[in-house]
């Protein structure tokens, strides 16, 4: 698939019959997989991304064995390249399939052990699925790395996240820990965050709680809808 090209006139160049593979839902490396992986270990993650996006077939056992044998090479890659590829992989349409594919899940967990809660996407009701589909990368990462340990702090230390995005993740994490896993909080807490940190922080916290909750909490859903359309008042100096 990666070897299909088009010129400025729209003429298609497909030297390895990638178009046919795409129709069949067949994902594989060009040539010797072991050699191709060693040329760039990031291709392990690219295989997972392409498999989740295009494959209609099961994994090739021999190929998976070669991927696993080369996993140590991932440590040679820069953190920026790893994060960039993770952003391409962590798409709402991929997450449910990823969380149900044992092989993809195992490989991702070995490469990114900080994504401890990736299984959360395996059982989404319609409301949770809608939230996930409308969420950006940073919120999706928050769902996977935040727990009652310092796991999210380590993820932020390990990868180069912008200060703005780092603040978003920390806000959810701190609120989670301060409120005992969101067991104790009320509208007053949310209002305070709205006025000090803005709408995005409130929606992040509420949507995080909705997705993490085992039961549907109508009060949370109502709050989320309220703050979605709420405008922060401008206080005169």
Which residues does each predicted region cover?
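C-terminal subdomains that position terminal phosphate/3'-OH groups for nucleotidyl transfer/ligation
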Residues: 105, 111-237
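Glycine- and charge-enriched loop/helix tracts that form the active or gating conduit
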Residues: 1-157
């Amino acid at each position: 698939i990666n070897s299909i090209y088009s010129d400025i006139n729209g003429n298609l160049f497909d030297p390895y019959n990638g178009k046919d593979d795409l129709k069949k839902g067949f994902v594989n490396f060009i040539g010797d997989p072991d050699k191709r992986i060693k040329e760039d270990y990031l291709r392990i993650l690219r295989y997972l991304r392409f498999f989740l996006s295009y494959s209609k077939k099961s994994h090739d056992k021999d190929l998976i064995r070669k991927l696993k044998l080369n996993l140590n090479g991932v440590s040679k890659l820069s953190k920026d390249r790893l994060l960039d590829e993770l952003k391409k992989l962590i798409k709402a349409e991929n997450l449910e399939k990823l969380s149900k594919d044992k092989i993809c899940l195992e490989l991702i967990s070995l490469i990114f052990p900080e994504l401890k809660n990736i299984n959360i996407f395996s059982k989404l009701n319609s409301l949770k699925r809608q939230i996930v589909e409308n969420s950006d990368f940073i919120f999706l990462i928050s769902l996977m790395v935040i727990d009652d340990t310092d796991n999210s702090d380590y993820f932020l230390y390990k990868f180069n996240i912008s200060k703005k995005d780092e603040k978003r993740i920390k806000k959810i994490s701190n609120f989670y820990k301060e409120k005992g896993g969101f067991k104790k909080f009320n509208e007053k807490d949310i209002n305070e965050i709205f006025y000090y940190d803005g709408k995005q922080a409130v929606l992040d916290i509420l949507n995080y709680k909705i997705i993490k909750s085992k039961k549907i909490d109508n009060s949370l859903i109502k709050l989320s809808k309220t703050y979605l359309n709420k405008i922060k008042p401008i206080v005169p100096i």
